[in-house]
């Protein structure tokens, strides 16, 4: 009779591999989470810059920014409330309004607290006036 040679991994070998994978995961996952937060902030910065450029084009055509009441929607749809724009572009100034990376609409104040217009995301917490707000007045803090 011949002895059959069994092949496979022992329980100890499998456990060692699982422990090593766990250690690697504990090192990699926090880094990925930090990168997601940074990527979300960078998207908000890019969106705010694009919205600010569109608002500048609106002002060039109409000699004024939209009011706070007209809001950023004035970039997509011609405002009907006073002051109505005198020279509104066909198709608006952007195709659609983006949402911030956390699923909230961007906000605009005209006149702003920090400049002629303030464009901002309320950040991850969704509340205005907190440290995670990203606005056209503090973009350098997030770059």
From Swiss-Prot:
Biological process annotations from GO: protein secretion by the type II secretion system
UniProt region (Disordered), positions on chain: 70-92
Propeptide position ranges: 1-8
Modified residues (N-methylphenylalanine): 9
NCBIfam families reported in the protein's UniProt record: IV_pilin_GFxxxE, typeII_sec_gspG
Cellular localization per UniProt: Cell inner membrane
Subunit structure and binding partners: Type II secretion system is composed of four main components: the outer membrane complex, the inner membrane complex, the cytoplasmic secretion ATPase and the periplasm-spanning pseudopilus. Forms homomultimers.
Transmembrane segments: 9-29
Function, as annotated: Core component of the type II secretion system required for the energy-dependent secretion of extracellular factors such as proteases and toxins from the periplasm. Pseudopilin (pilin-like) protein that polymerizes to form the pseudopilus. Further polymerization triggers pseudopilus growth.
This protein's name: Type II secretion system core protein G
Record's GO cellular component terms: plasma membrane; type II protein secretion system complex
PTM info: Cleaved by the prepilin peptidase.
Keywords from the named record: Cell inner membrane, Cell membrane, Membrane, Methylation, Protein transport, Transmembrane, Transmembrane helix, Transport
This protein's record includes keyword Glycosyltransferase: no
Sequence similarity: Belongs to the GSP G family.
Pfam families registered for this protein in UniProt: N_methyl, T2SSG
Membrane topology category: Single-pass membrane protein
Primary gene name: exeG
């Amino acid at each position: 009779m011949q002895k059959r040679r069994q092949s496979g991994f022992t329980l100890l070998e499998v456990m060692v591999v699982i422990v090593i994978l766990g250690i690697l995961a504990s090192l990699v996952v926090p880094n990925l989470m930090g990168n997601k937060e940074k990527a979300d902030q960078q998207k908000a910065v890019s969106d705010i810059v694009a919205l600010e450029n569109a608002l500048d084009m609106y002002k060039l055509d109409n000699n004024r920014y939209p009011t706070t009441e007209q809001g950023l929607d004035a970039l997509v749809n011609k405002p009907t409330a006073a002051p109505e724009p005198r020279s509104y572009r066909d198709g608006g100034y952007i195709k659609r309004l983006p949402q911030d990376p956390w699923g909230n609409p961007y906000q605009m104040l005209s006149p702003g607290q920090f400049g002629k217009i303030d464009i901002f995301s309320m950040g991850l917490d969704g509340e205005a006036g907190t440290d995670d707000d990203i606005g056209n007045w503090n973009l350098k803090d997030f770059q």
